[in-house]
UniProtKB/Swiss-Prot annotation:
Primary localization class, coarse: plastid
Encoding gene per record: PGPP1
Subcellular location: Plastid, Chloroplast; Mitochondrion
Entry keyword set: Chloroplast, Hydrolase, Lipid biosynthesis, Lipid metabolism, Mitochondrion, Phospholipid biosynthesis, Phospholipid metabolism, Plastid, Transit peptide
Stated name of the protein: Phosphatidylglycerophosphate phosphatase 1, chloroplastic/mitochondrial
Listed PANTHER family: 4-NITROPHENYLPHOSPHATASE-RELATED, PHOSPHATIDYLGLYCEROPHOSPHATASE GEP4, MITOCHONDRIAL
Amino acid sequence: MQTPSMAASTTSYYPIPKSFLLSPPRHKRNPNLISCSTKPICSPPPPSSSSSSPLQTTTTHRSQKQNLRLPTFEDSFLLYQFSSPTEDPGFSNRIPEQFDGEPRELVLPRVEDNNKGLAISSNMWWADLKAALGQRINIEGIVSSVSVVVKDRQFVLPHVSVKDLRYIDWEVLKRKGFKGVVFDKDNTLTAPYSLAIWPPLRPSIERCKAVFGHDIAVFSNSAGLTEYDHDDSKAKALEAEIGIRVLRHRVKKPAGTAEEVEKHFGCTSSELIMVGDRPFTDIVYGNRNGFLTVLTEPLSRAEEPFIVRQVRRLELALLKRWLRKGLKPVDHSLVSDITQFVKVPSDL
């Protein structure tokens, strides 16, 4: 599991400026565009009489050259931007202009449709970014940890601690009256950021499925959390890989109630088992809501982010200190002797 409890994919979208859209054309002109005026840019002078002298002809020719004006940048720009208002009545954002004495309308291209697609992409990117940060910065965990350290230290202590899932006797737990099992994901079932069950744990997981049937689920801050797994893609991918239901929830552990979990299993939380590797998240959440809590060792510390490793060290240091001082875990109504459901794996 990747959320530290005591501490904290990809381009941004910006609307395209309209001035950028009105830059001068640099590609060949569209032959379908209508010119802005039926008047010629320059009109040739009336033909001279046959009696004109060569000097007059030369003077007239020079005058024509002076009066002749080639299309300037402004002309090209207007020719490119203007169109007849009767050709496309659906356009908006038209700006009336004047050219050679005739009214014309400046057409600004619409970009709203493209913007919608870009905005959706930007929203998905932002959700993914929040998910990545949320797995490292657990605000709910920080607030809960302060409360635990100050007044609820017994919530950090699990009912039982084991090396991994292979040491749990699922048959005994079923006989004791437990109706379902809730697993954390990262470093409990899988390596961090992995979808595959840790290979040595597969026989134990299959045994748990055989004993509890469909009454097992994953309750994780890295998959199924509505705020960060906005389209359920992470939850669905994990379900397809491990064959275990991933619970959708709105609040990160250790905050929140067990209402969503109880609704899924159809029983009270006191009849459920919470298995996880983090004392200040999985165990605090389980004890606070009445689960039987089982703490496992992390499967792979090497693949954890640096901040998670440091927070984990602090959590375990506090846990060991409080145990040395004689602090006891909260009582559970279905179990009096926790050693009954701990076994030594046969394959070790």
